[in-house]
């Protein structure tokens, strides 16, 4: 089983994550923010990952520190579970509709971090500025060593847009991390 435990404690956040890449979709999530709990539950379910997450942050200031640090911790956990990346499929893609919204995620978990985030919508879900999800996925990409392309083609309801992004990310990561053979997925011979 490809599992990792990652903790991060700063003056702003305290996060503990247990992540099983080869899970069954189980989750036990408590970030103290209902919408974030919902997104991580979707990530676990649609990626077939097991996620146990306890997090708290200085949300009395705003949500930036908590959301970015959750991305850091998730990225580190993904990187740890991929081990030497031998035998993985490496590339994944998903296109997910959520009612009127359509999100597409393409992913390369071959060890090179890069983020393209084409989510051209502004606003708030409750009191969370949705622009913070770009910081979340940037942290996942950087700390997970993932090239991550997120495109929202259209949508109106901000909840549906972000939910479609999380579901597409889950499906693409699940696909890319699947054991596909025994070789390192690179003609260079290294990742």
From Swiss-Prot:
Compartments where found: Cytoplasm
Predominant subcellular localization, coarse grouping: cytoplasm
A GO cellular-component term linked to this record: cytoplasm
InterPro entries attached to this UniProt entry: IGPD_sf, ImidazoleglycerolP_deHydtase, ImidazoleglycerP_deHydtase_CS, Ribosomal_Su5_D2-typ_SF
Enzyme class: lyase
GO BP term, pick one: L-histidine biosynthetic process
Record EC number: 4.2.1.19
Pathway(s) this gene product operates in, as recorded in its UniProt entry: Amino-acid biosynthesis; L-histidine biosynthesis; L-histidine from 5-phospho-alpha-D-ribose 1-diphosphate: step 6/9
Keywords: Amino-acid biosynthesis, Cytoplasm, Histidine biosynthesis, Lyase
An annotated Gene Ontology molecular function: imidazoleglycerol-phosphate dehydratase activity
Protein family (similarity comment): Belongs to the imidazoleglycerol-phosphate dehydratase family.
Name of the protein in question: Imidazoleglycerol-phosphate dehydratase
UniProt lineage: Bacteria, Pseudomonadati, Nitrospirota, Thermodesulfovibrionia, Thermodesulfovibrionales
GN (gene name): hisB
């Amino acid at each position: 089983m490809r599992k990792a435990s990652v903790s991060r404690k700063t003056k702003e956040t305290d996060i503990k994550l247990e992540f099983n890449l080869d899970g069954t979709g189980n989750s036990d999530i408590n970030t103290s923010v209902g919408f974030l709990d919902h997104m991580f539950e979707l990530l676990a379910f649609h990626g077939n990952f097991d996620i146990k997450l306890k997090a708290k942050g200085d949300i009395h200031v705003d949500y930036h520190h908590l959301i970015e640090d959750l991305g850091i911790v998730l990225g580190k956990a993904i990187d740890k579970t991929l081990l030497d990346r031998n035998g993985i499929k490496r590339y994944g893609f998903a296109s997910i509709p959520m009612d009127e919204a359509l999100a597409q995620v393409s992913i390369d978990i071959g060890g090179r971090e890069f983020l393209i985030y084409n989510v051209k919508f502004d606003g708030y879900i409750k009191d969370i500025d949705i622009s913070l999800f770009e910081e979340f996925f940037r942290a996942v990409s950087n700390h997970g060593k993932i090239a991550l392309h997120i495109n929202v083609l259209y949508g109106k309801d901000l909840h549906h847009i972000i939910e479609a992004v999380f579901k597409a990310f889950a499906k693409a990561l699940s696909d890319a991390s699947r054991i596909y053979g025994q070789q390192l997925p690179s003609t260079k011979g290294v990742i």
